[in-house]
């Protein structure tokens, strides 16, 4: 800035004017060469606050060394324009210019920094206020180059000096201020803060983020420690964030409210319904108004009532669901459970009721609690009427169903279904006449099997001993047990039978054909004497008490008093009949009484019928205990004694006529029965060491095949099986097919008087020969690269075997490999396949 010298500075000194006439000094040119002084009317209407603000401003900016006293002139230090003594010359920014305007007169002009030039004590205060405001608003200082340019360019200053009665007041005017009262009030407040309060500078507010408004009440820390204050602040911030995120969290209370206020469109409960298909009218109780709330509560109460009603209905109808499958498989769950074919129809219902309590879990708590509620009359009757199906009908349906077990070849039969164990009474003539193959349905009779068919009782076939023989399953036939023929105690044959275990002799013809036996020779079992233990039932189902207890005596008709027996004894008696244990004592007694009645009837019935009149036509020699179970050589077969005992006759072989016409042979047997007049002294040796085993009657099937004749001559071992007595009035037992293919024993027959005895040629087992022939087959050459498997390879690969082809190959090629002259029938080959577990079938069904 150029220096104008002392002459120029003299013009800035304020003129001495009277106290009544204020003067406005205006600097027009930048060179400060001219000065125009305009007199202003001293208006008494100046606002009081404006005048007061000016006075306070002057007092605040006054210096202690230079007090401002009215009507006193002070010496001034002349400094350069815009400068202050001992300070840096700073330019005045354009925004800092002030304009003091009168509301009545707007023609006044302002002049800045004139007071600093005229008076030394006014300029420093003005500069301090401006610099203080610059620091607060814009902390960054401009550069020195910018300061010099602004000093040269913006050098025009305006101001107003007011002189009161004794004081001279100079007030700068700001252009930007439009309301002078607000401007002076803010200036007065800033002066007070700079003067005495010394407050801290306010921090600048961040514009890029606004904190969340704290709606919680501020917690007051009584301790006032800075650590607690910081912890409270952090806790408040964390609470704010939790409250913000709590709206997105899962609330269990809201879910319960939705479930309580939810109302389905359909009354019926739904299962497996997606959320998209749920009704849209599910609302909480908070969102519903008073009317919908009332309707919702009523609907929910009705819905809850319906649900409770359905639950009550389920509890009332809660019972064990018994299906046909469960009843069918329930017979084979326990070893003591009897077969359904051997249970009388009168005890079927009792058996089912005894099975059902065993399946239910015991509930001791319910039994210990006393029943306070009384039974409502009529509820049991309604429950009985509303039962879906009675149990007896389901059981009758089970009894009529054919339960078949085995492979496909075993199930492929052409006979009637009653052959498979559906008819318990095999003694009827119509069943025997209609069925081609008479197969016993009892497990004990399953030991006697023919060459062409086996017992179809899977459980009986599975029970074998170590030697391969079939075991007797303890089954009690409560319907029609066969009485046992017991010899007299004084008979000498009883002692002879125990010594003759290795061979049996042929009795004479009269004893073989038999005649009617006296009632004294046939002794009935004592059904009521003694207690039947479980060990007795495990030995044999048809073995009765000892002969010493079953002698001629009156039958006791009085029923035993089961009430005096203890519960374990009753359980043992019940187990002896083949039933499962029952919890209720009354039920056990009732079941035992019914069993006793049915057993008494079965014991009394044979007294009105003739006893077994005929003895077997064929006497069988047993196999030694150490014999092989499957196949035996010809050397192991036991030959009959060459010298027959006294009173016996010589046998003869079965002729082809008798084989081809079994009806004729049976007719001749009946004729011999009638023609025989002399009773025999020696009873047939059919009892053996085991009292329950009786000799088996062999019936030769009607066939014209010569191969069948040769196969019938093979040695077999027929273990005698107990046969049931027919209910018909016939005087003889219908023959049964019972031959074991894996056992060998010579068959001895009787002949007329005068014929010579012929020794039976022992031949190897035909089944063993079939096995050897199949294994001896050489490998077949491949045809066009395709291998041709042998019969043994087909069997190993579980290929189905055509019986026709295998029989043809055995008769043509197979037996020649092992030098066997006999031939076999397809039915015999099928029997061999079934004994080996081979799947086989006929190519052309007949």
Curated annotation (Swiss-Prot):
Protein keywords: DNA damage, DNA recombination, DNA repair, Nucleus, Phosphoprotein
Record flagged with keyword Phosphoprotein: yes
InterPro entries membership: Slx4_ascomycetes, Structure-sp_endonuc_su_Slx4
A GO CC term assigned to this protein in UniProt: Slx1-Slx4 complex
Compositionally skewed regions (Polar residues) per UniProt: 293-303, 657-680, 725-751
Biased composition (Basic and acidic residues): 141-153
Main location: nucleus
Entry protein name: Structure-specific endonuclease subunit SLX4
UniProt source species: Arthroderma otae (strain ATCC MYA-4605 / CBS 113480)
Gene that specifies this protein: SLX4
């Amino acid at each position: 800035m150029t220096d104008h010298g002392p002459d120029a500075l003299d013009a800035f000194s304020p003129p001495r004017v009277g106290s009544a006439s204020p003067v406005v000094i205006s600097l027009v040119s930048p060179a400060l060469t001219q000065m125009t002084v305009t007199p202003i009317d001293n208006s008494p209407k100046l606002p009081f606050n404006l005048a007061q603000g000016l006075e306070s401003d002057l007092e605040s900016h006054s210096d202690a060394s230079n007090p401002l006293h009215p009507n006193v002139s002070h010496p001034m230090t002349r400094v350069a324009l815009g400068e202050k003594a001992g300070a840096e010359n700073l330019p005045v920014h354009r925004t800092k210019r002030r304009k003091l305007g009168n509301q009545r007169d707007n023609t006044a002009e302002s002049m800045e920094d004139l007071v600093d030039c005229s008076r030394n004590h006014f300029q420093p205060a003005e500069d301090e206020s401006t610099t203080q405001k610059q620091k607060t608003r814009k902390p960054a200082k401009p550069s020195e180059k910018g300061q010099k340019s602004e000093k040269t360019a913006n050098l025009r200053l305006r101001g107003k000096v007011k002189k009161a009665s004794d004081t001279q007041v100079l007030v700068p005017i700001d252009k930007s201020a439009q309301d002078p009262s607000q401007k002076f009030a803010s200036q007065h407040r800033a002066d007070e803060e700079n003067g005495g309060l010394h407050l801290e500078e306010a921090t600048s507010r961040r514009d890029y983020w606004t904190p969340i408004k704290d709606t919680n009440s501020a917690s007051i820390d009584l301790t006032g420690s800075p650590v607690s204050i910081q912890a409270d602040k952090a806790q408040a911030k964390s609470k704010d964030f939790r409250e913000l995120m709590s709206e997105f969290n899962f609330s269990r209370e809201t879910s319960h409210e939705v479930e309580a206020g939810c109302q389905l469109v359909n009354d019926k409960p739904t299962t497996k319904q997606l959320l998209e298909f749920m009704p849209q009218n599910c609302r909480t109780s908070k969102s519903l108004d008073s009317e919908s709330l009332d309707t919702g509560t009523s609907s929910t109460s009705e819905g809850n009532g319906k649900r409770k009603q359905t639950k009550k209905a389920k509890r009332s109808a809660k019972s064990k669901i018994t299906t046909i499958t469960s009843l069918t498989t329930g017979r084979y769950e326990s070893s003591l459970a009897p077969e359904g074919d051997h249970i009388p129809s009168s005890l079927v219902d009792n058996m089912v009721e005894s099975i059902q309590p065993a399946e239910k879990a015991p509930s001791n708590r319910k039994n210990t609690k006393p029943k306070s509620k009384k039974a409502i009359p009529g509820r049991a009757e309604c429950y009985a009427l509303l039962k879906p199906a009675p149990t007896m009908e389901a059981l009758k349906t089970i009894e009529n169903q054919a339960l078949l077990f085995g492979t496909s070849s075993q199930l492929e039969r052409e006979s009637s279904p009653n052959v498979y164990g559906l008819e318990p009474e095999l003694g009827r003539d119509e069943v025997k006449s209609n069925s081609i193959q008479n197969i016993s349905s009892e497990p004990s009779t399953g030991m006697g099997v023919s060459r062409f068919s086996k017992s179809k009782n899977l459980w009986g076939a599975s029970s074998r001993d170590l030697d391969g023989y079939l075991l007797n399953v303890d089954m009690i036939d409560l319907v029609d047990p066969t009485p046992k023929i017991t010899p007299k105690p004084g008979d000498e044959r009883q002692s002879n039978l125990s010594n003759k275990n290795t061979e049996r002799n042929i009795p004479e013809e009269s004893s073989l054909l038999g005649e009617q036996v006296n009632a004294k020779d046939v002794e009935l079992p004592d059904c009521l004497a003694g207690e039947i233990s479980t060990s007795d039932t495990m030995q044999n189902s048809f073995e009765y008490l000892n002969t010493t207890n079953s002698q001629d005596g009156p039958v006791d008709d009085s029923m035993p008093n089961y009430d005096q027996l203890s519960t374990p004894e009753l359980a043992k008696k019940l187990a002896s009949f083949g039933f499962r244990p029952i919890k209720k004592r009354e039920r056990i007694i009732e079941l035992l009484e019914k069993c006793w009645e049915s057993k008494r009837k079965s014991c009394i019935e044979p007294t009105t019928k003739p006893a077994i009149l005929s003895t077997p036509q064929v006497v069988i020699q047993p196999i030694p205990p150490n014999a092989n179970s499957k196949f035996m050589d010809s050397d192991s077969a036991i030959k009959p004694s060459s010298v027959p005992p006294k009173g016996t006759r010589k046998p003869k072989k079965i002729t082809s006529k008798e084989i081809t016409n079994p009806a004729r042979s049976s007719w001749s047997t009946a004729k011999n029965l009638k023609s025989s007049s002399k009773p025999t002294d020696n009873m047939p040796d059919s009892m053996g060491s085991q009292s329950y085993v009786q000799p088996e009657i062999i019936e030769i099937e009607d066939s014209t095949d010569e191969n069948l004749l040769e196969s019938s001559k093979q040695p077999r071992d027929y273990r005698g099986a107990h046969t049931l007595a027919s209910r018909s009035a016939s005087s003889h037992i219908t023959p049964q097919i019972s031959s074991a293919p894996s056992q060998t024993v010579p068959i001895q027959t009787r002949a007329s008087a005068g014929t010579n005895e012929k020794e039976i040629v022992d031949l190897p087992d035909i089944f063993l020969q079939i096995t050897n022939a199949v294994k001896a087959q050489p490998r077949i050459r491949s045809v066009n690269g395709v291998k041709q498997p042998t019969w043994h390879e087909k069997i190993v690969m579980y290929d189905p075997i055509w019986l026709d082809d295998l029989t043809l190959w055995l008769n043509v090629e197979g037996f020649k490999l092992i030098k066997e002259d006999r031939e076999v029938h397809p039915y015999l080959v099928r029997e061999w396949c079934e004994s080996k577990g081979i799947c086989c079938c006929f190519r052309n069904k007949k």
